Amino acid sequence: ASTEYYYIDKTMMIKEFIDERPLVTLFTRPRRFGKTLNMDMLRTFFEKTDEDTSIYFENKKIWSCGQKYRDYQGKYPVIFLTFKDVKFDTWEETFESVRDILAKETQCHEELLTSEKCDKYDRQKYEDLASGNVNEVRLSAALQDLSDMLHRHYGVAPIIIIDEYDTPIQQGHMNGFYETVVNFMRNLFSGGLKDNPHVNYGFLSGILRVAKESIFSGLNNLKINSVLDERYSEYFGFTTAEDRKSTRLN
């Protein structure tokens, strides 16, 4: 936190998730409700990195909940994607943008190139993804392929986090390529989140609850949490008590 900003502690969201342990959760909330901040918080808490990220949580509520919850900190490889800037008028531009996003995320896991758990075929897949040298079919398998390699390398299945999952879909609806983008996203999400033994948990956030039949078809393990649900409601936006407290601080 900075002296120029207020930080509202939402880390008890992590405790609720660990207690409930849903496999895949979709959070839908309006704009400016803290979706991206919460997805980043989940990433920072769970992700296994060279940096000691526990320092960001030592003075937060989750840390006072005990060792059971601390043991989850920094223990998982994480695949993190955000589609918030995928705002284009054509499918071709949208595909290129999604391909670049997946390429950059793949590059963040360069340890796979030298992993003893990955063979030459895995390394070729990695290089193709990292360089963007893939067609639609291969790109739609990116989450499945990357999670498979990470699982074998670390011996722990990764967590997949996708922020603003619905931005490309909204653009498709407005610009006449809805069916194309929905078909692609369905294959991408299914490969990464449906019956995938190489994923521990999945988190998605967005504004819209796109019909489950259209994009999450067959994803029986999906739990949808919307603005109408009481559970997790205190972790998005500000509660009345938080608003009053910040006003007093001001």
Where are these regions (language model features)?
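Conserved small/polar residues in nucleotide/adenosyl-binding loops
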Residues: 245-250
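Conserved P-loop NTPase "ATPase switch" module shared by AAA+ and STAND
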Residues: 154-178
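Walker A/P-loop nucleotide-binding motif
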Residues: 23-41
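Short regulatory helix/loop adjacent to the ATP-binding pocket of P-loop NTPases
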Residues: 197-199, 210-228
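Substrate-engagement module of ASCE P-loop NTPases
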Residues: 106, 142-152, 180-200
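P-loop NTPase motor core
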Residues: 9, 15, 44-111, 237
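Conserved P-loop NTPase mechanochemical-coupling segment
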Residues: 80, 86-140, 168-175
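Structural recognition of the conserved hydrophobic beta-strand(s) that form the central parallel beta-sheet
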Residues: 159-163, 187, 200-207
